[in-house]
């Protein structure tokens, strides 16, 4: 994308009917590390890939706790996500204090849509540069919602956002018919397999770079990090690309592996 006379402010329309500042914010989501959300009849699961800014830094948190029945995973600007997460927590607290009941997931997503729409229509403001996957469980069952910097939000059976997320979405589309009948362990494994598709061929999922969030019937939202992720990774089969590569004798050069597709 290149600068032009129609991208100076979010209130300026281009002749093609586009708002470039919003499109730039959507690009920020694509730069964030990938995250996957999917649901069955009883549970909703978030799986996220964590990044470290440098070898000296700890991995950033990608899954955040909102309420006992809701959690989010993020892709994009972490600072913007932190602000939206605090807003969501406050709304959930208000619901419990005023009405003595958990806030319905769809109502919370609607409030987030209204809040993120305001900067897209006011001079001198910029859109939030973060996309959210919201997992929750209420009287209507498990939910996975996606929110965008454009203030649109979508109710999904499964979704992936972030860098190279198209590979994960392809996996989800291919196996979507299996999710509703899955037990919790199988659902998490599907999420891990989809997330693994976003990695280059030479990398794999580890306890350091994966975070898992689970919520469901009779199960409050729980985040699994570091060693807590091990039981889920142990049951995961090896990547098909690695299985297909036989060990080459020392005197025979190994064939060059296919380059991972860029998305």
From Swiss-Prot:
<comment type="subunit">
    <text>The 26S proteasome consists of a 20S proteasome core and two 19S regulatory subunits. The 20S proteasome core is a barrel-shaped complex made of 28 subunits that are arranged in four stacked rings. The two outer rings are each formed by seven alpha subunits, and the two inner rings are formed by seven beta subunits. The proteolytic activity is exerted by three beta-subunits PSMB5, PSMB6 and PSMB7. Interacts with NOTCH3. Interacts with ZFAND1.</text>
</comment>
<dbReference type="GO" id="GO:0002376">
    <property type="term" value="P:immune system process"/>
</dbReference>
<dbReference type="InterPro" id="IPR000426">
    <property type="entry name" value="Proteasome_asu_N"/>
</dbReference>
<feature type="modified residue" description="Phosphoserine">
    <location>
        <position position="177"/>
    </location>
</feature>
<keyword id="KW-0391">Immunity</keyword>
<keyword id="KW-0832">Ubl conjugation</keyword>
<dbReference type="GO" id="GO:0043161">
    <property type="term" value="P:proteasome-mediated ubiquitin-dependent protein catabolic process"/>
</dbReference>
<comment type="similarity">
    <text>Belongs to the peptidase T1A family.</text>
</comment>
<dbReference type="GO" id="GO:0005634">
    <property type="term" value="C:nucleus"/>
</dbReference>
<dbReference type="InterPro" id="IPR035144">
    <property type="entry name" value="Proteasome_alpha1"/>
</dbReference>
<dbReference type="Pfam" id="PF00227">
    <property type="entry name" value="Proteasome"/>
</dbReference>
<keyword id="KW-0963">Cytoplasm</keyword>
<dbReference type="GO" id="GO:0019773">
    <property type="term" value="C:proteasome core complex, alpha-subunit complex"/>
</dbReference>
<feature type="cross-link" description="Glycyl lysine isopeptide (Lys-Gly) (interchain with G-Cter in ubiquitin)">
    <location>
        <position position="115"/>
    </location>
</feature>
<feature type="cross-link" description="Glycyl lysine isopeptide (Lys-Gly) (interchain with G-Cter in ubiquitin)">
    <location>
        <position position="208"/>
    </location>
</feature>
<feature type="compositionally biased region" description="Basic and acidic residues">
    <location>
        <begin position="253"/>
        <end position="263"/>
    </location>
</feature>
<keyword id="KW-0325">Glycoprotein</keyword>
<dbReference type="InterPro" id="IPR050115">
    <property type="entry name" value="Proteasome_alpha"/>
</dbReference>
<dbReference type="InterPro" id="IPR001353">
    <property type="entry name" value="Proteasome_sua/b"/>
</dbReference>
<dbReference type="GO" id="GO:0005829">
    <property type="term" value="C:cytosol"/>
</dbReference>
<dbReference type="Pfam" id="PF10584">
    <property type="entry name" value="Proteasome_A_N"/>
</dbReference>
<feature type="region of interest" description="Disordered">
    <location>
        <begin position="232"/>
        <end position="263"/>
    </location>
</feature>
<keyword id="KW-0647">Proteasome</keyword>
<feature type="modified residue" description="Phosphoserine; alternate">
    <location>
        <position position="110"/>
    </location>
</feature>
<protein>
    <recommendedName>
        <fullName>Proteasome subunit alpha type-1</fullName>
    </recommendedName>
</protein>
<dbReference type="InterPro" id="IPR023332">
    <property type="entry name" value="Proteasome_alpha-type"/>
</dbReference>
<keyword id="KW-0597">Phosphoprotein</keyword>
<keyword id="KW-0007">Acetylation</keyword>
<comment type="function">
    <text>Component of the 20S core proteasome complex involved in the proteolytic degradation of most intracellular proteins. This complex plays numerous essential roles within the cell by associating with different regulatory particles. Associated with two 19S regulatory particles, forms the 26S proteasome and thus participates in the ATP-dependent degradation of ubiquitinated proteins.</text>
</comment>
<dbReference type="GO" id="GO:0005839">
    <property type="term" value="C:proteasome core complex"/>
</dbReference>
<feature type="modified residue" description="N-acetylmethionine">
    <location>
        <position position="1"/>
    </location>
</feature>
<keyword id="KW-0539">Nucleus</keyword>
<keyword id="KW-1017">Isopeptide bond</keyword>
<feature type="glycosylation site" description="O-linked (GlcNAc) serine; alternate">
    <location>
        <position position="110"/>
    </location>
</feature>
<dbReference type="InterPro" id="IPR029055">
    <property type="entry name" value="Ntn_hydrolases_N"/>
</dbReference>
